[in-house]
Design a protein with these regions (language model features):
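Short beta-alpha junction loops
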Residues: 40-42, 148-149, 288-290
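Short helix-loop capping/hinge motifs at secondary-structure junctions, enriched
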Residues: 92, 118-121, 149-153, 226-230
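Short, conserved active-site loop motifs that form the nucleotide-linked donor/cofactor pocket
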Residues: 63, 239-240
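C-terminal segments
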Residues: 108, 115-141, 158-225, 246, ...
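Alpha-helical scaffold elements adjacent to nucleotide-binding pockets in ATP/GTP-utilizing enzyme cores
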Residues: 48-52, 152-159
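Rossmann-like NAD(P) dinucleotide-binding subdomain of oxidoreductase/dehydrogenase enzymes
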Residues: 1-127, 144, 299, 303
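Short, charged/polar "capping" segments at the starts of alpha-helices
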Residues: 44, 92-93, 151-152, 267-272, ...
């Protein structure tokens, strides 16, 4: 049978995208009691969900929202039977070795253009980079090009530059907003990691908003080799590294990827990509990296972590209930009882 591994499931929720909260709802369906520690940046989505679940009949002993600081958050993880935590490399290093914690770390999603017609797929690259505000782990942060990598970088930068800066409350806002200090810190961090990479986008990424805060304009950088360390940099705004790639580079630069969009006619390469353990999802053809749908696992099914197979062996016939005095077993019941006890 399919059995739970525990009773209480703790979630240290992220604040990058509302859709991440769809995952822990599955734990409720499996019979877990769920405790959610929301992100301080975006506590609204889990609050709405928990409120709706309360109205639907779930009790406070079944699902609870626990806003806490980071110190108490770790206590929550330790007290639960199982936990799911989101974060960057530091979180992955802290919890990654524990079997009772599911770490949702950096996605480092990628696009491979290797069909000889890279110019036809610019829209797919732009969607993969900028879709959902580029805040999701399934947004592409690196593009590998078998061909004209500089040309692809320029076209992607041109298309992304057409995104209009809007305050976050606007209906047509696309770019994520930050405190001005945070936006400038992200820009400075990016500049400090360029090394030999060429910044294709404009030099000033920070766009301060009249009402306060700022958004970061998209950043496109061109690298000179597929194994450059910058391809692993993932930032919470449209930021993508474009690198040359050839069949001689193989699968190695494409590893450690949540979602890889692979546009190539090479079936042998596709087979190797699908079989590569460090690549969680492979989209073949013009399908953006953030493409998801009902029944399609994002990073495996949550049930694979929360549940396990359990063997239960029992007699084919249960022990019968006591009968009123004088009432006799039917012939069939008598035969089955004899069979169970080895008398038939």
């Amino acid at each position: 049978m399919w059995a739970r591994k525990g009773e209480v499931f703790a979630v240290l929720a992220p604040g990058n995208h509302p859709a991440t909260h769809a995952a822990w709802l599955e734990a409720l369906a499996m019979g877990y009691r769920v405790a959610i520690r929301p992100s301080r940046r975006e506590p609204f989505t889990p609050h709405r969900l928990v409120s709706a679940l309360r109205q639907a009949g779930f009790g406070s002993d079944q699902v609870v929202l626990l806003p806490t600081d980071h110190t108490v958050a770790d206590v929550l993880v330790q007290a639960a039977d199982l936990a799911m935590v989101y974060g960057g490399d530091e979180v992955a290093a802290t919890y990654g070795a524990r079997a009772d914690i599911l770490v949702q770390g950096p996605g480092r999603s990628k696009v491979l253009l290797a069909d000889g017609h890279s110019e036809r797929h610019i829209a797919t690259v732009v969607d993969s980079v900028g879709g959902h505000g580029a805040t999701a782990c399934v947004n592409a942060t690196a593009v590998f090009v078998d061909g004209d990598a500089p040309g692809v970088a320029r076209e992607v930068a041109r298309s992304l530059s057409e995104i209009v800066v809007r305050p976050p409350e606007s209906d047509d806002a696309v770019l994520p907003a930050f405190r001005v200090e945070r936006a400038k810190a992200l820009q400075n961090y990016l500049r400090g990691r360029l090394d030999t990479a060429e910044m294709i986008s404009g030099p000033d990424l920070v766009a301060e908003l009249p009402g306060g805060g700022a958004v970061l304009r998209p950043a496109v950088m061109l690298l000179d080799r597929a194994d450059a360390p910058q391809v692993n940099i993932e930032l919470p705004f449209p930021c993508v590294w474009v690198a040359p790639w050839s069949p001689a580079d193989g699968v190695a630069p494409l590893r450690n990827t949540l979602t890889l969009t692979a546009i190539t006619p090479d079936e042998d390469l596709l087979t190797r990509l699908v079989e590569e353990p460090s690549i969680s999802n492979v989209h073949v053809g013009d399908r953006p990296t953030f493409l998801m749908g009902p029944g399609l696992p994002h990073d495996g099914h949550l049930a694979e972590f929360l549940m396990r197979s359990k063997t239960v062996i029992r007699d084919r016939s249960p022990v019968p209930l006591p009968r009123p005095e004088g009432e006799r077993l039917t012939g069939k019941e008598s035969f089955r009882m004899r069979e169970v006890h080895g008398l038939g």
